């Protein structure tokens, strides 16, 4: 018993008898409000604890031979699908080989509504034209090239063959004077889509090297190791490259990613504008808390625009160009659970802090009320 008596001397929380305790309405109000605040702060701390935190790290990118997946969804409200070509080039200006892609073109009317329910699958570097059914023609025929024959081009059985032959000569005749083009409805196709727009969506998988992909009018080809587009045969007088980028990303999305070009609306101030997007791609590895590893990319971008009146030379080519280069550094983002001890510390701080503040407020209210009451009572006696 003597030992217990000595132990009581260390009690930092001495108790008073119940008869000497005074309960007030102000104290009850402070208790209820502080209890609600304590519960709210506890739930906030619990929610914070249940979320994961992401730790970034920076490494040198040592990956080799990987592919770069480019997700595309771009609308051209004033550029018909029949006129639009899409190409992927490497840093040297050569057309990329072994490019896997799944791109589609959707014709749009002037209000942006799809003209047809099905989109056309697009081949890189080609424009879409309606081809006459070959079943009714002699498969062994050899039709005229209209004076544009060459050593490797003796027969021109399609409008595209005639256009290619004349392209090498530097000029293309009126398609209405060429039997193959009349038969395939080349002019009708161009006229039919003249006031339409086009939505291009899908993905490209290119080699993981610096390069570009672009949307430009006309048929593309290589001439003396220079990439050019044939616009003459399409009769394009007013090239409007106004565009709306619904989505553009390099790889899969991960939680919290920001694609800076999403929902970008650009209006061409005049005809024949060339829009260039200079993109810096940063390889990124995102490791989820369950162990799943996601290899993707982030990117930053700057935009430049100018008038392009020429088909070759410094004036450039009307269109939308995305020129990308890859960073030598890699970002690793790792999801981790938050510390349980940190959660306990936060809860204790909330409870202790609220009790302390509530006690101070209650004491202030109680003693202030007593002081006021004393003055009132003193005034009555005098």
Curated annotation (Swiss-Prot):
The keyword Glycoprotein applies. Belongs to the ERGIC family. Glycans are attached at residue 265. The keyword Glycoprotein applies. GO terms for cellular component: COPII-coated ER to Golgi transport vesicle; endoplasmic reticulum membrane; endoplasmic reticulum-Golgi intermediate compartment membrane; Golgi membrane. One of its GO terms (biological process) is retrograde vesicle-mediated transport, Golgi to endoplasmic reticulum. InterPro entries: Erv, Erv_C, Erv_N. It is found in: Endoplasmic reticulum-Golgi intermediate compartment membrane; Golgi apparatus, cis-Golgi network membrane; Endoplasmic reticulum membrane. Residues 1-25 are annotated as: Required for MARCHF2-mediated degradation. The modification Phosphoserine is found at residue 116. Residues 47-340 are lumenal. Possible role in transport between endoplasmic reticulum and Golgi. Positively regulates trafficking of the secretory proteins alpha1-antitrypsin/SERPINA1 and HP/haptoglobin. This is Endoplasmic reticulum-Golgi intermediate compartment protein 3. It comes from Macaca fascicularis (Crab-eating macaque). The record marks 8 as: Ubiquitinated. Its main location: endoplasmic reticulum.
